[in-house]
């Protein structure tokens, strides 16, 4: 759906809020930001490559988990490179189609994390609470359906969100954040009724949270009950280790998200601090997730060291 414009004065070139960095700190910030981005790309890329190439990871859990580093790459790549370029070039111009694309991808990332974590929790519930039926339930068809449902639902919901935004006439050209999102794009409109947009946005956020949290709470509650009732300590330890990474990731995502939202509700917080909180939502998890999964998932650690050994033998 193409955006409507109220008059000929609307420019496709938008002014986006600047992230203030002292002149003497511009290049250090750019250098550190680039290292953070490259670290995230490298680590998430390694996780993706391991799942694709290591037969020990060709299991339903890791096929579903494949979507998590993929989403992390979408999130951080949609935000950090452009922000770093703007900082070093002192530019604050963004074109409307690029702005819409960035906003869509950032919203897609946030939704995909919630749905993928719910899918992983469901897989762990079946594996730990119904181990004898695991392979009969988590067939390739079921795994593919779970992955398609997670991404398909997210994409469909975000398409509707941005289609509702695109129908509004535009006349303003200032983006009040350092990145584009649905709310920033809504503020470009003039004269249009955004009631439907606000209602849908609230319903969308609530739906995603309720679905994701409900599935995870149910799954991990059942897993906890199974662990408590299980007599073998090794089985308990394995169950806890296999779920800890997902719980850490979900907790971090919710804490950072809530912190970022609350930062805009208090007027005494400096604008730059608010912008940092917003940026953290799309950078913290993409950087930390590979570390979290590498430390807490034994199969990934073993696959990584096995791949290193193969490479070492290949060059000797």
What are the residue ranges of the model-derived segments?
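Transmembrane helical core of 7TM receptor-like proteins
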Residues: 1-316
């Amino acid at each position: 759906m193409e955006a409507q414009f109220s008059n000929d004065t609307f420019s496709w070139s938008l002014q986006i809020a600047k992230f203030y960095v002292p002149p003497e700190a511009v290049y250090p910030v750019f250098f550190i930001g680039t290292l953070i981005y490259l670290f995230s790309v490298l680590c998430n890329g390694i996780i993706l490559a391991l799942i694709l190439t290591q037969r020990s990871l060709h299991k339903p859990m890791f096929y579903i988990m494949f979507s998590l580093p993929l989403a992390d790459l979408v999130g951080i790549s949609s935000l950090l490179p452009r922000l770093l370029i703007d900082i070093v070039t002192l530019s604050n111009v963004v074109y409307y189609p690029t702005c819409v694309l960035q906003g869509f991808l950032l919203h897609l990332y946030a939704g995909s994390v919630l749905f993928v974590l719910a899918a992983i929790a469901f897989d762990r519930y079946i594996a730990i609470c119904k181990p004898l039926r695991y392979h009969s339930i988590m067939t390739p068809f079921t795994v593919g359906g779970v992955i398609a449902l997670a991404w398909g639902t997210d994409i469909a919901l975000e398409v509707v969100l941005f289609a509702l935004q695109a129908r509004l006439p535009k006349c303003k050209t200032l983006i009040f954040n350092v990145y584009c999102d649905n709310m920033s794009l809504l503020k470009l409109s003039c004269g249009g009724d955004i009631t439907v947009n606000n209602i849908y946005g609230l319903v969308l956020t609530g739906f995603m949270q309720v679905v994701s949290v409900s599935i995870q709470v149910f799954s991990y509650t059942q897993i906890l009950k199974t662990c408590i009732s299980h007599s073998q300590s090794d089985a308990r330890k394995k169950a806890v280790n296999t779920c800890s990474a997902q719980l850490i990731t979900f907790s971090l995502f919710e804490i950072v998200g809530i912190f970022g939202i609350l930062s805009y509700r208090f007027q005494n917080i400096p604008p730059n601090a608010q912008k940092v909180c917003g940026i953290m939502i799309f950078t913290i998890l993409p950087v930390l997730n590979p570390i979290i999964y590498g430390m807490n998932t034994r199969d990934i650690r073993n696959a990584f060291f096995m791949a290193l050994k193969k490479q070492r033998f290949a060059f000797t």
